[in-house]
UniProtKB/Swiss-Prot annotation:
Its EC number is 7.6.2.11. InterPro entries: AAA+_ATPase, ABC_SmlMolc_Importer, ABC_transporter-like_ATP-bd, ABC_transporter-like_CS, Mo/tungstate-bd_C_term_dom, P-loop_NTPase, Transp-assoc_OB_typ2. It comes from Lactococcus lactis subsp. cremoris (strain SK11). It is a peripheral membrane protein. Pfam families: ABC_tran, TOBE_2. It catalyses: ATP + H2O + polyamine-[polyamine-binding protein]Side 1 = ADP + phosphate + polyamineSide 2 + [polyamine-binding protein]Side 1. One of its GO terms (molecular function) is ATP hydrolysis activity. Residues 6-238 form the ABC transporter domain. Belongs to the ABC transporter superfamily. Spermidine/putrescine importer (TC 3.A.1.11.1) family. It is found in: Cell membrane. ATP binds at residues 40-47. This is Spermidine/putrescine import ATP-binding protein PotA. Keywords: ATP-binding, Cell membrane, Membrane, Nucleotide-binding, Translocase, Transport. The keyword Translocase applies.
Amino acid sequence: MSKTIIEFKNVSKTYADTDTTVLKDISFELEEGKFYTLLGASGSGKSTILNIIAGLLDATDGDVILDDKRINDLPANKRNVHTIFQSYALFPNMNVFDNVAFALKIKGVDKKEIAKRVSESLKLVRLDGFEKRSITKLSGGQKQRVAIARAIIDRPKVLLLDESLSALDMKLRKDMQYELRELQQSLGITFIFVTHDQEEALAMSDWVFIMNEGEIVQSGTPTDIYDEPINHFVADFIGESNILNGKMIEDYLVEFNGQKFEAVDGGMRKNEPIEVVIRPEDIWFTLPNEGKFNVKVDTQLFRGVHYEIVAYDEFNNEWIIHSTHKAIVGETVGLDFDPEAIHIMRLNESEEEFDARIEEYVEEEETVGLAKAVEEENAEEEAAIQEAVKEALENTMELTELAETVNEILQKQENETENSESGDHK
């Protein structure tokens, strides 16, 4: 089990002069050597958490633990934590070497050791040979790398990154996402990244915290959060979503848009009001009346890798569809999707209740899945026997030959059963 490097225990932050609470009873544990992202809009509290960890802000209530020690009263310069700000905070009057070496010089580290470690750090960020380059002569991406090299030169326990990619252009920002992730994995230190950009969070993180109005709304892996948003806010915040009101008729059967649809969610009350989420990329077009229902195409935009198409159904619900096929504005088409594309959100469900429900029906699904696999295997064997009978009738196969074929199939089934039981006993 990985070691916990940072822990928040019921941490709150209130500004007394305005009586404004920006963090509300925050608790979490972060494991050593992972990439975490605090994701939220401006004012959600994500940068406040970062500044409390760094020692730039004091928590009003609660405990902040770093490497098994309470650090609420520990000065910022005594914490083995480094921060990279959005502005990078580089010294324009110093060259690259002096910027990267700054912290080691302050600590009085030997000159030979400084030179060695500066060289190692610059190599890690792919800037070897830039030691004498002026900061003013660097591109935005190069400045970003210098800031990272300076932050990692004395191997902090935790690296904090506050919106540190937001000043870069789109292509460079995507390149830096790969580089940051690779760097974190090669160094093995904990990264805590703050952003409002959903794509950055999903691309780089081991674990994401979604924040809103000073609270953690949902936390989980990028895949979990994207595929199973806990509520309307998360579903809408993480990528494009089609969100509709509906009713859970029973486990695995949901009603919305005046129709009943097979789903994969369970663990709810019968006829419970819910919200349905279907991602735009999980929908495809059909001919009219051949899909789940019809829609009329209203607008479309070309996004480079796909068309983003907006359409409306007979109830005037808006549907966003991502398709590689161009639509015709004004035409009526059918929409279709798989049961797995329908994600169910309960109203006012806490994260603890949500996690428990997901775990419960996932376990049930695994059990049902095993039984279904056995059933399908038996059906395949029965189909094979029927096919052999059919072939015998069509080709006047001798009865003895037919019997041998059937016996071979049955013997194979018996052997597989014995092998399976033998494996279970081991």
